[in-house]
């Protein structure tokens, strides 16, 4: 916090520390010795009690307790009689007392936090420390003898104690009574010390030698970060064994890759010894020849690590097939990690962090044990007398009473020399009493009263009702009121109607002042009386005061910034606030009983800011997406739609021509021309054919705007408003909006539009459509009964039929409505004037779906699970529903209500986490000057462009020049802002990727710079410094979440299943281009694609890509490469309900491991009696023992193997399949007895390329709404691992697939011989399951088949190996059975490509592909969830949240920094540390980026105040106090909490220097001066 922003506080940072006993005593004003509170007769506080006036101060202002001194003149005097200081009673809120504890007590927060702080320091488990603290066990300290000292020092489990003379390493044992009696009770020697309770813990903690401890722990964790760069003498001395192993790794690698070091025999050395001596710089290596020598032999002789690396690189230049040197480095790292137990290092790191925390902060460990307990000031734990002589008290008083009682009893027992066991029990009870006071229920059962747990100090801080969230972050304020809202159509947009009675109350002080100024009242008291009597003068003054004094209106829930706006009040009669109809959408307000709150900004600055920044006219555009928020709706839309409707032929005045708008309006007013007549009017120099209605609309347009000659619906209006905003600016647009409101209301009223049952026309074609659909479903049932399709397919197809039928009915209905003429008021109108139709089409109310339900058919309904009920509701609301249909309908309605309730809370919590993680991001500077940028490309999902490039780059700043890819001319320069025109220009030039500046790459030290952020979308200009963009981002993402979850219930659960896409058409003319398309031709001569990632593109003459569509595996391709096509040409089609397994070659078919009731179940359908063979494992074991496959063997004997995943259905004609009993070698072997199975066998079945071998039915159609989407958003933001994670390749390379099994069996069916081979973990199996092998054929690299026969493998799954021949790197992945492989043997994959199905894990993407790819992935995934719902949110908001998720790095090698290995620190902190070390010239730390979920990111923020007010208050405060954390007060939350001006908006340093002097006061001051002199 800078000097300027300190405001009223004499500090700029806040540090949290442990309080030492001396501190506590120094705060205290006296010791509380008695548990009494007030005297019940006199109601005066008892002396030395919990409310003692002597300790805490007087009860009445300036009056001592006995009444001897009264009045301000005695201030500061201490009464001799009662000992009370005469001062204000306010000190009772400030003065602490204290209790001297008779025995030390452990502070429960440091005992029971996970992991326990005391436990971590003493190297004991948390349970052990607890047992000692609660007198269940003894703590025995074992000191070393002289001969044991070195052993103890090396032992990991010892801790250093310093007795003031020297440091000794000791062991701690926690033993129970019996063990203690047995082993230690009678040993008198100095070797053991023992004790119980907090005393012994305090003793040990106070003796702890932190420096020695820290040194030892650093040694333990050091080897964790050893890499090739660290090898040398230094490491050897400390870690001999490890060093030897690492040398062996290097030697082994050198041998394996044939890198030889020459001259070993001459020196009598082994390779290991030579490498050892080179690393220790005792030998020289000639990197040219590979000779070793004892002397330096010139330039080409090197020694140490560099010699080995350099020599290896030279050898690799000649031998390309050996891996790059990175491979050796990797081997060294993996050996280090293998040798060192991770858990041990983690534990040491935790302890080290804690020890370092104590060292840096200046806290002492023994302060975690309390000797003195502070007592809260009495006003903060009040005791109030109720009527009837009862008292209401704060729970804390009960706790303090119990502590004092127990403490006094303990003192008495100690004085009486009571038996040890009694004293121990009393000490335990004291410990428990203090625990309950600090954190009730943290250990054991909470202390209750009348069955309610009492609230302890911790409870007063944490949770929604705690101090932080209830009283510091959200306060109730004065000068506010709330009332119901009603519509105020005659208001202007910047006004609101404020009830007079409310205004009088809100503006009271202003009214008093005005009454005095005008001489109506002589004093404030007099003014008060006038206001109470409500005299006419009062109303006059109120009018003057309210004029031009803005008020803030707020509607809860306040989901985003526009939920609070400023208005100028207009005084109205009645008791309801009047709201302008245009500002309803941003508030999400309607007038069915909503309430709103009014707040009065008091200061002149506050009023100014309300006017300039918060006035409703300044909030036309949404900060989330930059489109208008303040929009005409309902009647206003309907009115404008009605008057701008297409002309109706044959109306009065048709064909007339008018010279000016005025003439048209005059004629319209006099009734000479009908509002929908076709007329001509002169605009500028040309004649335009239009209608009087459209002229009327254009007459309210701002001057100089082009003539709008089209029907305007809601979308059209929105677009128009945006265009006007760009062209004429804010002020004119607002005036126009107000005129639209007037016109819309007026015209929709005059049109007399209303709805009647007659307007709902049930289409005549409905009956036929339904009959057709029923016929189709019957056919599908028949196919199912004959066994042609499975139950799942039947379901999918029926759903499809009904979706289509619903769409047809709805289409027919709209067509009929449009065609049927109407007679209104004796005039004939076309069908498009049907009121219901107009309302829906114009976007005024309702939508096509709702009309379809009213007059078409309700259609399919969804179940709770999200599937559709396959019998649709055929009736509509006009015809009425049958009982069954009504019953089915209730489903959806209930689901809607239940969802709403649950999801609102969920969305609210998501918003809260987002706000917390991003709250401290503000715009801190104009330009950070970075050259980095973020690459933007259109978002493409399933082959279609979901978000075009121009929408993504609009409002951003370019990070580099944009050149035309064809001409090379520069279209736009770096640091230019992209507006709509430029965005359009860039996309027209055929540019696919643009690098823009982004918050993700911004290099501003704190927050983000204005250039990287780009436009403030609500103002359409570069964002100003000080804007709280983090909060805006969080609200923009959170608000639609809440909105959408609330919206489910409006549709009433009638689901519209998307008709499944089963083909793709060209959208534009051009040439066909194939991407990765692999074709085979099937029996029918059709071209079938068998590539997994194929796409078809359309390019124009110059070869620019116009569109691109992904084509699934098994699709039929209908065009040739290079073919010229017109738009709407079908390019490919496929079966949307199944995935196929297709024979890619022709040949004979063999079935392998397809065994009845083991790997195949015959699904006999109860209804159809037909069976389908479905792959599924009957027992989990079968999945290990068998792998069902189909093999196709070509004429030249090559095998093509197709694995059958679970749920695959065999597509082989039943007559070709027979069952045979055979011995199953794998089962027989595992059960150790002969077991036979029924195998499926195929007799001479030939297939041709393109034949379908099996099909896998797809998941059933489900209803998609954001409810499914919100958990996905949460999963992404919390960086959770998805349910079904995909396996990604870590390197580029070629795929090899091997079986993964413990053993291979070869079985000869003729002789019945079997041979078993057990397979080691890292051996690769070279044969496939079911393959025939000859004797002598290799099974693995080392094992050979001893007999002819068929291979049986007990597979667990597959080993997929990715090998890169160029670098020599390889990675292997285990793919379990049941996971679907997306790659085939021999495919080339890139790093980060998916090898299996599933959702990629964000952390993997970060590790493999790096930060930018991860950012792209997260951004696209989250955007898609919202886009599916049609919610528009600008990328920059997501980028800010993602920036916060990636702000941490993990230290791999600390170098000379203050960090520890494995510690997660902010990038900023790392940067600061690197700068410091560069100046001092030390070794720089190394770090890797980490991805942190939003909850963790919010908790690990640098500000402890902000973290504590978010979640897990206790833990945050405990950690912060131990480390002595300093809060720099940079973010918004921490400043709100301490009551400071927040560092955003006008609270930024830049603006704080400016002073505002109101003009009036200046004048008054000048006038006053001569007065004083006169």
Swiss-Prot record:
Reactions catalysed according to its record: RNA(n) + a ribonucleoside 5'-triphosphate = RNA(n+1) + diphosphate
One GO BP annotation is: DNA-templated transcription
A family per Pfam: RNA_pol_Rpb1_1
Q: Where does Mg(2+) bind?
A: 590, 592, 594
Annotated positions binding Zn(2+) 1 = 64, 66, 79, 82
Gene Ontology, cellular component aspect? DNA-directed RNA polymerase complex
Q: Look up the coiled coil feature and give its residue ranges.
A: none
The entry assigns this protein to a family as follows:
Belongs to the RNA polymerase beta' chain family.
What is the protein's given name? DNA-directed RNA polymerase subunit beta'
Binding sites annotated in the UniProt record for Zn(2+) 2: 928, 1002, 1009, 1012
Q: Which SMART domains match?
A: RPOLA_N (SM00663)
Relate the protein's function as given in its record: DNA-dependent RNA polymerase catalyzes the transcription of DNA into RNA using the four ribonucleoside triphosphates as substrates.
